[in-house]
Regions:
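Short catalytic/ligand-binding loop motif for oxyanion handling, primarily in non-cytosolic enzymes
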Residues: 61-63, 114-117, 146-147, 208-211, ...
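N-terminal active-site segment of His-dependent metallophosphoesterases
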Residues: 27-28, 32-118
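Core catalytic region of metal-dependent phosphoesterases/phosphodiesterases
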Residues: 86-152, 159
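His/acidic metal-ligating clusters that form di-metal
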Residues: 95-105, 175-264
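Active-site glycine-centered loops adjacent to acidic/histidine catalytic or metal-binding residues
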Residues: 57, 110-111, 141-142, 204, ...
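Short, surface-exposed linear motifs at loops/turns and structural transition points
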Residues: 1-47
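Binuclear metal-dependent phosphoesterase catalytic core
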Residues: 2-9, 21, 41, 184, ...
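Beta-strand-turn-beta hairpins that frame and shape the catalytic cleft
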Residues: 42-53, 61-62, 67, 157-167, ...
Length: 271
């Protein structure tokens, strides 16, 4: 059993394929469900201007979810015999949750597929395009480019009331690791300078950050965005006070760290 979603009024827990959703809760209040204790978030002041949703690592085509190379320590998630494949179950559940929020946009941050096959891309489109149509915005991940493809590799700029979102391609075709090119960072800087609104940056790979205790190894084969490009992203963010954070997927976990400039760099768990 794990807690997968917490807002100011909703808590969602997953136990394999079983979902437990608790709604109409009070903000900043501690609750215990199924032996797990969690506190709802504070409700922001002011008027709600926009709602958008994001998912990543949806991995259509995967059978055993949670396997990393030859490491099968897991936890490994798979469907019950006779059920739809695990990604189909989880993504259709995610789409149902998202639809209930009436989002202006749904942003998918890469790893749409397991192996980058046409069948897997079609399965992704059948699920997400059928639910969200012109609200859908997509960027690729490493799994979507292992065969050298260039689908969904264009950086995107999304404007909504109260916020802008820059969605950036971090994939390197045929590679697991990530990068952001100098030209992309110049584009981000120009876009951020063009608006007074808050800007949230999104991509597939997580950012490298130095460990304050000095324990993070600086390596060109870092599993996320390489250290030099990660530093360059920090420099752009530091230059523009309206850039409020970077969010990624790739690691399949929830984690929040800080860039050197103090702005949050966030990893969002897989579907």
């Amino acid at each position: 059993m794990e807690i997968t979603t917490v807002s100011d009024e909703v808590i969602v827990l997953h136990d394999g394929c079983d979902v437990y959703r608790y709604e109409d809760l009070q903000p900043e209040t501690q609750y215990t469900f199924h032996g797990l204790t969690v506190t709802t978030l504070a409700r922001p002041d002011g008027e709600l201007l926009s709602t958008f949703a994001t998912v990543n690592d949806v991995h259509f085509g995967e059978v055993d979810c949670g396997v990393l190379g030859d490491n099968r320590r897991g936890p490994i998630q798979r469907s019950r015999p006779g059920d739809m494949p695990y990604p189909e179950i989880m993504n259709r559940g995610a789409c149902a949750e998202i639809l209930a929020t009436h989002p202006a946009y749904v942003i998918v941050k890469g790893d749409l597929t397991h192996a980058g096959s046409d069948i897997e891309f079609d399965a992704f489109r059948d699920c997400y395009e059928s639910h969200f149509a012109d609200k859908l915005r997509v960027i690729r991940g490493n799994h979507d480019a292992y065969l050298g493809q260039h689908l969904y590799d264009e950086d995107l700029w999304i404007e909504m009331p109260g916020i802008c979102v820059a969605v950036m391609d971090t994939a390197i075709p045929t590679e697991t690791t990530g990068d952001i090119a100098a030209g992309q960072l110049a584009w981000l800087s120009e876009r951020a300078a063009s608006t007074d609104l808050p800007v949230l940056v999104m991509g597939h790979h997580q950012q490298w950050t130095p460990d304050p205790a000095g324990g993070t190894r600086r390596s060109e084969d870092y599993f996320g965005i390489n250290p030099d490009s990660s530093d360059a992203l920090n420099d752009v963010v530091a230059k523009h006070r309206n850039i409020i954070g970077y969010t990624a997927g790739h690691t399949h976990r929830h984690r929040v760290r800080s860039m050197a400039c103090g702005v949050p760099t966030i990893e969002i768990g897989c579907v």
